[in-house]
Amino acid sequence: MKTTKTTFTIVSALASVILLTSCGSNTTKTQETKASSTKNQVTMTYDQQRSQENTMSVLWYQKAAETKALYLQGYNVATDRLKEILQTPSDKPYSIVLDLDETVLDNSPYQVQNVKDGTAFNPKDWDVWVKKATAKAVPGAKDFLQYADQNGVQIYYISDRTTSQVDDTIKNLEKEGIPVQGRDHLMFLEDGVKSKEGRRQAVQEKTNLWGQPSRLCRLL
């Protein structure tokens, strides 16, 4: 899962004006002070608005019945479709690829902490969260993936988590009852590699790859 950090900065042009007119009238200084105060108020209002928006988004994700319903619907559709596909024999084993964050694992507690701290995503805090291995499975993911595993489907997790986070991620998945078919089935981000497409192609070369069911579960 990645979060875009937005930085909003207002640079006051009044600073140079105040220096140049330090010998001016008290009226001018008063006007400049009021203008500077107004700009500070704009900054606070914007920051407060952004914080409120982030809070509402996280609360909706965690509490809204629609969130659970959408995940369950997506994974139910994926399960039905997989059942149909498995009726057709294949020389290669069938496989599926999924992302992890917000597709299999729910990282909203990490987002909640960011809201409380007034911070955005950063790699250091994210790594601390991953090491806790406490993310819960999103609704429907466990049943779908267990069905796939029990029916001989190869499951690959293609994620932009780093390779140093593989062990903690395996620990988290196993705690949630999510099938892990080997370390080589967790295809994480390596130095110099950004695109997931190359990893998908590597899976496709040795298996009969069935798309990416996570697309059915994506919340739009």
Regions found by a protein language model. Name each.
Residues 60-71, 127-134, 156-162, 187-190:
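Second-shell loop/turn segments in exported
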Residues 27-37, 44-48, 162-220:
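C-terminal cap/substrate-recognition subdomain and adjoining C-terminal extension
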Residues 83, 87, 109-110, 146-154, ...:
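Sec-exported extracytoplasmic/periplasmic mature domains
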Residues 2-14, 20-98:
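Non-catalytic pre-domain segments flanking phosphatase-related domains
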Residues 128-155:
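Short, acidic loop-to-helix structural element flanking the phosphoryl-transfer center
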